[in-house]
Amino acid sequence: MLIIISPAKTLDYQSPLATTKFSQPEMLDKSQALIEICRELTPAQISSLMGISDKLAGLNAARFSEWQPDFTPANARQAILAFKGDVYTGMQAESFSEADFDFAQQHLRMLSGLYGLLRPLDLMQPYRLEMGTKLANPRGKDLYAFWGDQITEKLNQALELQGDNILINLASDEYFKAVKPAKLSGSLIKPVFLDEKNGKYKIISFYAKKARGLMSRFIIQNKLTKPEQLVDFNLEGYEFDAGLSAKNELVFKRAEQH
């Protein structure tokens, strides 16, 4: 099984590292091309394009100008330890063992607007470039056009390497749009997480993001390799609901949190 997740806007380049192992991103030539486009933007243009404050735009203009592709542990950090949003709060990679990192390196991929597809231990320098950004480029009007089939091709290679054809989609819709399901040489399974609110079960964004991280951790720490094992997921009160589930959509429910 290969898991895909979204990246995070919040980054952490300060905390102690849980592993010294690292790898290099496989699509850095593409990242370099995007960086060169982004370096042409003024902070005001970045603010408008990304819908962020002037202060954040200034920070990201500086990141674009400082980015250089000779990544080392001194100037970059492993992606799984650099991202710090809700998904990564659920995953808690800082508590992984070396065996967990090894399993994750084979079975987990992070989608990225700048890096395309990252393995957990791939070094990355800080950036902000969400997949939905309408950044004009030689291939079209946005990043979906820029990446085209390339991310899907990388996923197919990863599926082949890890020995089966099951892709677990734990990414957001914005990021999964960068994958072409018709061109995937595998079958998709999408876990869905419903939380109770006032007696009704629905997707609550904050909880759902964290649950995607919890599911990733459950698969990695238990070294799961078969989709039927996913129904045992029970972290933080979630339970599988067979009645609401289908072959390619597994539904997990949780009682209201107090």
Curated annotation (Swiss-Prot):
GO biological process, one term: response to hydroperoxide
GO CC field: cytosol
Domain of life: Bacteria
Pfam families membership: H2O2_YaaD
Family: Belongs to the UPF0246 family.
HAMAP family, per database record: UPF0246
Protein known as: UPF0246 protein YPO0462/y3714/YP_3720
Species annotation: Yersinia pestis
